[in-house]
A protein has these predicted regions:
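Conserved donor sugar-nucleotide recognition element shared by glycan-biosynthetic enzymes
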Residues: 1, 26, 141
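C-terminal alpha-helical cap/extension of soluble enzyme domains
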Residues: 87, 98-187
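Catalytic alpha/beta core domains of metabolic enzymes, predominantly
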Residues: 7-14, 22-128
Length: 187
Protein backbone atom coordinates (compact mmCIF):
# COMPACT_ATOMS: atom_id res chain seq x y z
CA UNK A 1 0.00 0.00 0.00
CA UNK A 2 2.91 2.37 0.63
CA UNK A 3 4.04 2.20 -3.00
CA UNK A 4 0.48 2.82 -4.12
CA UNK A 5 0.16 5.89 -1.87
CA UNK A 6 3.57 7.18 -2.99
CA UNK A 7 2.33 7.03 -6.58
CA UNK A 8 -1.24 8.23 -5.98
CA UNK A 9 -0.95 11.15 -3.57
CA UNK A 10 1.15 13.48 -5.78
CA UNK A 11 -1.46 13.11 -8.55
CA UNK A 12 -4.48 14.03 -6.43
CA UNK A 13 -6.03 17.49 -6.76
CA UNK A 14 -7.61 17.23 -3.28
CA UNK A 15 -6.52 15.96 0.14
CA UNK A 16 -6.90 12.23 0.79
CA UNK A 17 -8.68 10.62 3.73
CA UNK A 18 -7.58 6.98 4.01
CA UNK A 19 -10.29 4.36 4.33
CA UNK A 20 -9.33 1.00 5.82
CA UNK A 21 -11.98 -1.59 4.94
CA UNK A 22 -10.20 -4.91 4.51
CA UNK A 23 -13.41 -6.98 4.31
CA UNK A 24 -14.11 -5.38 0.93
CA UNK A 25 -10.66 -4.40 -0.33
CA UNK A 26 -8.79 -7.51 0.91
CA UNK A 27 -5.91 -5.29 2.04
CA UNK A 28 -5.26 -3.37 5.22
CA UNK A 29 -2.98 -0.42 5.87
CA UNK A 30 0.09 -1.56 7.78
CA UNK A 31 1.11 0.47 10.82
CA UNK A 32 4.27 1.77 9.15
CA UNK A 33 2.23 2.89 6.14
CA UNK A 34 -0.18 4.77 8.41
CA UNK A 35 2.69 6.35 10.35
CA UNK A 36 4.28 7.53 7.09
CA UNK A 37 0.89 8.76 5.87
CA UNK A 38 0.77 11.00 8.93
CA UNK A 39 3.91 12.74 7.62
CA UNK A 40 2.22 13.53 4.29
CA UNK A 41 0.27 16.82 4.60
CA UNK A 42 -2.08 15.82 1.77
CA UNK A 43 -3.24 12.73 3.69
CA UNK A 44 -5.56 14.19 6.30
CA UNK A 45 -6.85 11.26 8.35
CA UNK A 46 -8.13 7.69 8.40
CA UNK A 47 -11.49 5.97 8.71
CA UNK A 48 -11.19 2.42 10.00
CA UNK A 49 -13.92 -0.08 9.17
CA UNK A 50 -11.88 -3.18 9.97
CA UNK A 51 -14.15 -4.06 12.94
CA UNK A 52 -10.97 -4.72 14.94
CA UNK A 53 -10.42 -2.85 18.19
CA UNK A 54 -6.88 -4.25 18.27
CA UNK A 55 -6.11 -2.63 14.90
CA UNK A 56 -7.81 0.59 15.98
CA UNK A 57 -5.78 0.72 19.21
CA UNK A 58 -2.59 0.31 17.19
CA UNK A 59 -3.62 3.22 14.96
CA UNK A 60 -4.51 5.34 17.99
CA UNK A 61 -1.08 4.50 19.40
CA UNK A 62 0.42 6.41 16.46
CA UNK A 63 -1.46 9.63 17.25
CA UNK A 64 1.30 11.14 19.41
CA UNK A 65 3.21 11.36 16.11
CA UNK A 66 0.48 13.68 14.74
CA UNK A 67 -2.25 14.42 17.32
CA UNK A 68 -4.31 16.58 14.93
CA UNK A 69 -4.76 13.67 12.48
CA UNK A 70 -8.40 12.48 12.68
CA UNK A 71 -9.09 8.80 13.20
CA UNK A 72 -12.72 7.81 12.67
CA UNK A 73 -14.47 4.47 12.99
CA UNK A 74 -17.03 3.05 10.57
CA UNK A 75 -18.96 0.36 12.45
CA UNK A 76 -21.43 2.21 14.64
CA UNK A 77 -21.44 -0.69 17.07
CA UNK A 78 -17.84 0.34 17.89
CA UNK A 79 -18.38 4.11 18.12
CA UNK A 80 -18.48 4.44 21.90
CA UNK A 81 -15.53 2.10 22.48
CA UNK A 82 -13.54 3.87 19.77
CA UNK A 83 -14.16 7.35 21.18
CA UNK A 84 -13.43 6.19 24.72
CA UNK A 85 -10.13 4.79 23.39
CA UNK A 86 -9.20 8.10 21.73
CA UNK A 87 -10.74 8.07 18.25
CA UNK A 88 -12.09 11.39 17.03
CA UNK A 89 -15.54 10.09 16.04
CA UNK A 90 -17.27 7.98 13.46
CA UNK A 91 -18.94 7.93 10.09
CA UNK A 92 -21.90 5.72 10.92
CA UNK A 93 -24.77 4.66 8.68
CA UNK A 94 -27.44 4.80 11.37
CA UNK A 95 -26.65 8.48 11.95
CA UNK A 96 -28.38 9.18 8.64
CA UNK A 97 -31.61 7.96 10.23
CA UNK A 98 -31.19 8.84 13.91
CA UNK A 99 -28.53 11.59 14.02
CA UNK A 100 -29.32 12.76 17.56
CA UNK A 101 -28.69 9.28 18.97
CA UNK A 102 -25.20 9.11 17.47
CA UNK A 103 -24.32 12.68 18.46
CA UNK A 104 -25.45 11.99 22.03
CA UNK A 105 -23.44 8.77 22.14
CA UNK A 106 -20.36 10.56 20.83
CA UNK A 107 -20.77 13.36 23.37
CA UNK A 108 -21.28 10.94 26.26
CA UNK A 109 -18.20 8.94 25.28
CA UNK A 110 -16.16 12.10 24.83
CA UNK A 111 -17.24 13.24 28.31
CA UNK A 112 -16.51 9.82 29.82
CA UNK A 113 -20.11 9.45 31.04
CA UNK A 114 -20.07 5.67 31.10
CA UNK A 115 -23.61 5.20 32.40
CA UNK A 116 -24.97 7.33 29.55
CA UNK A 117 -22.66 5.57 27.06
CA UNK A 118 -24.06 2.18 28.10
CA UNK A 119 -27.64 3.44 27.77
CA UNK A 120 -27.10 5.00 24.33
CA UNK A 121 -24.92 2.17 23.05
CA UNK A 122 -27.72 -0.28 23.81
CA UNK A 123 -29.99 1.80 21.56
CA UNK A 124 -27.38 1.77 18.78
CA UNK A 125 -27.25 -2.00 19.12
CA UNK A 126 -31.04 -2.14 18.78
CA UNK A 127 -30.75 -0.16 15.55
CA UNK A 128 -28.05 -2.53 14.34
CA UNK A 129 -29.88 -5.71 15.30
CA UNK A 130 -33.23 -4.44 14.06
CA UNK A 131 -32.39 -2.77 10.77
CA UNK A 132 -29.23 -4.47 9.56
CA UNK A 133 -30.15 -8.11 10.13
CA UNK A 134 -33.15 -8.31 7.80
CA UNK A 135 -32.30 -10.41 4.77
CA UNK A 136 -29.74 -13.09 4.11
CA UNK A 137 -26.72 -11.44 2.53
CA UNK A 138 -23.96 -9.02 3.46
CA UNK A 139 -25.96 -6.40 1.57
CA UNK A 140 -28.50 -6.49 4.43
CA UNK A 141 -26.79 -3.53 6.12
CA UNK A 142 -27.08 -1.16 3.17
CA UNK A 143 -30.49 -2.52 2.18
CA UNK A 144 -31.77 -2.10 5.73
CA UNK A 145 -30.44 1.43 6.01
CA UNK A 146 -31.66 2.56 2.59
CA UNK A 147 -35.00 0.86 3.13
CA UNK A 148 -35.46 2.57 6.50
CA UNK A 149 -34.48 5.93 5.01
CA UNK A 150 -37.01 5.40 2.20
CA UNK A 151 -39.76 4.45 4.64
CA UNK A 152 -38.91 7.62 6.58
CA UNK A 153 -39.26 9.73 3.44
CA UNK A 154 -35.59 10.73 3.30
CA UNK A 155 -34.46 9.04 0.08
CA UNK A 156 -35.32 6.33 -2.41
CA UNK A 157 -34.25 2.77 -1.64
CA UNK A 158 -33.04 1.99 -5.17
CA UNK A 159 -29.57 0.51 -5.31
CA UNK A 160 -26.92 -0.02 -7.95
CA UNK A 161 -26.90 -3.47 -9.51
CA UNK A 162 -26.43 -6.23 -8.61
CA UNK A 163 -28.18 -5.16 -5.39
CA UNK A 164 -31.93 -4.84 -5.20
CA UNK A 165 -34.20 -3.15 -2.71
CA UNK A 166 -36.10 -5.26 -0.21
CA UNK A 167 -39.24 -7.00 -1.36
CA UNK A 168 -42.59 -6.51 0.38
CA UNK A 169 -42.07 -9.05 3.22
CA UNK A 170 -38.71 -7.49 4.16
CA UNK A 171 -40.13 -3.96 3.82
CA UNK A 172 -42.99 -4.92 6.15
CA UNK A 173 -40.49 -6.24 8.73
CA UNK A 174 -38.44 -3.05 8.33
CA UNK A 175 -41.56 -0.94 8.90
CA UNK A 176 -42.32 -2.92 12.06
CA UNK A 177 -38.78 -2.39 13.38
CA UNK A 178 -38.92 1.33 12.57
CA UNK A 179 -42.25 1.65 14.35
CA UNK A 180 -40.69 0.04 17.42
CA UNK A 181 -37.45 2.06 17.34
CA UNK A 182 -38.59 5.53 16.33
CA UNK A 183 -40.41 6.40 19.59
CA UNK A 184 -37.30 5.37 21.54
CA UNK A 185 -34.91 7.42 19.43
CA UNK A 186 -36.70 10.68 18.69
CA UNK A 187 -37.31 13.49 21.18
Amino acid sequence: MQDYLDHLVPELPLPLFLYNMPALTKVSFEMETVRRAMDEPRIIGLKDSSCSMIYLHRILGLLPHRPDWPVLVGPEEMLSDAVLAGAHGGVNGGANLFPRLYVRLFEAARAGDLARVRELHSLVMRVSEGLYRIGKHSSAIIKGLKGALALSGICDDGMAEPFQRFRDPERARLRQVLDELTPLLTP
